[in-house]
Curated annotation (Swiss-Prot):
The keyword Iron-sulfur appears for this protein: no
Pfam families recorded: CCDC22_CC (PF05667), CCDC22_N (PF21674)
Designated name of the protein: Coiled-coil domain-containing protein 22 homolog
Organism: Aedes aegypti (Yellowfever mosquito)
Family note: Belongs to the CCDC22 family.
Gene Ontology biological process terms from the UniProt entry: positive regulation of ubiquitin-dependent protein catabolic process
Composition bias, Basic and acidic residues: 574-589
Molecular-function GO term, any one: cullin family protein binding
Amino acid sequence: MDEIDNIILHSLRQIECNLDEEVISLDDLSPSMLVQVVSKCISLIDPGLELPRTLPPGMAQRFTATASLAEACRTIGYRRDIGYQTFLYSNVAEVRRVLMFLVEKLPKEAADKTSGSGQPVDSATQLENRILSSLQSQLQAPWMPEFCQVGRPEGLSTTSGGESPAQIAFRRFIPRKISVPFVTQGDVAAEVKEFWSRRNLDCLDEGSLVPSLIAANDGAIKTNAKGAIDEVDRQVKLPAINEKLLQYYSKGGTKHRLAEPSGAAASSGTTEKVVLNNITVETKPGKTPLESLQEEIDALQQEIVQHSEEGVQLESSRKETDESIEEYRKTIVRLKEEKKIKERTHILLEDPEVNVKKLEAIIAAGGERMKKLQDQWDAHRIPLVDTLEAYRLKNSDKLSKSQQVLDQIESTRQKCEEVVIDLQTKGAMYARLQKEFEKLNKTVSRTAYTSRILEIIGNIRKQKNGIDQILQDTRSLQKEINNITGQLDRQFTVTDDLIFRNAKKDEHSKRAYKLLVTLHSDCEELIKLVQETGAIKREVRDLEDQIENEKGRNTAANLAQITHDLTEMQNESQRLEESIRRMEVTSRQ
């Protein structure tokens, strides 16, 4: 038990229960410490329960708090007897059962903490934990198409969040800030403008060039500086920019032209052309190339939305088609089964007389075969049944002998218990005499000691002889009972056989046979009553032993504590009544 207590206390300390170093066993747990420990464990098992963390000072509050703890223990599955007395007037065995139950019910995190806390984690374990967490996060993330993941900024969530497919596809439109401090000023030299334009445009990659230009032009329009980027486009004639734009439009995957040339506009000369080497963008009067690009982007967005809706409709129609195909398959299978049945029926109906005779012959052959199988089964079953009956008879004889042996063992056990009780009595007497001997004067003569020892030895020898005589008488009595029982059984068997033979011819013999059977049943009932009486006596002895064990507990100390608590409660009640009276008097005044 000390080892179990150490394990329980170690587990409680690992879950951060405030236990003093002086607490080395469960006997050292006071009611307040026990309440704190149980409350901590229950809060870890079920955090939703509201429980008192400490034991209140008042007796009424103590009873309420401990009763709530007992109810919480029953709520989480404790099936033994528990109440406020378990915490206020605790018994070590009950406390051990409660704490063992709570430690076993602790959640996995707390159990891991109790088993592995304080151990350093090596780098390999840390790496495995990081890999595990990364894989778990990737597995929990929803799947996204590949084209929706291109150009996604770092840290952007992979969930769609209810966005349309067009919005997901156009996430790659990521503009960057273009810093052109004084390119648009009139007094700046062309070489300086070219230098700053080249430097700023070379800082951009092919994916963010066009979005950056569009965003910068839009900002210039908002700040009443319309045409700032257009002037740069007109003045800067760089092969690098042309190559980047060509690569962008060739890799962008779009097959649409930026703007279709209009014949009427070309003939009338109402269109304006902005040329960057090999790239030509025709714009309508009053519109910039950025606006034309924006219109093209809007058109592409509408097409993407339209294609997405068409894809959803096609998917729904595909599902409906799959369902109809499955129904058709089931119908085909059912029709094939019906076709087989009808074909067989048609074959039978082609020549009914011959087919009926064939069926009758098959049925007759099956009946004969069944009869042969039944005969074979009976031929195998009857010997096995006889063998089984013989084994049952042998088993019943063995059971009767086993019962006799069990009765002998039980009687021997009772005698051993009596001897043990007698030995305990003698041990108590020996302890008492030992204490008396220690209290005696050391100057007692050797003769008194010798006579006392001889007297004790004589008494012990007499008691031993008496016990041996009782055991011998019991053994002889048991042997006589067994012999008489065997003789009675044999005599009853012989008498039953003789009277049964004459009972068929003589009426008196028949009556004597009935009386013999009644006598035998009465004797068996009497034996059963004697056995039940012995069992009741054994139960009485067990109950007496339990009473002695209960007397050995600290019942007196618990009663004294209960009396003390009752006195405190009465004093508290009196103080409360006095305070209520004072408050009433104050309110009346």
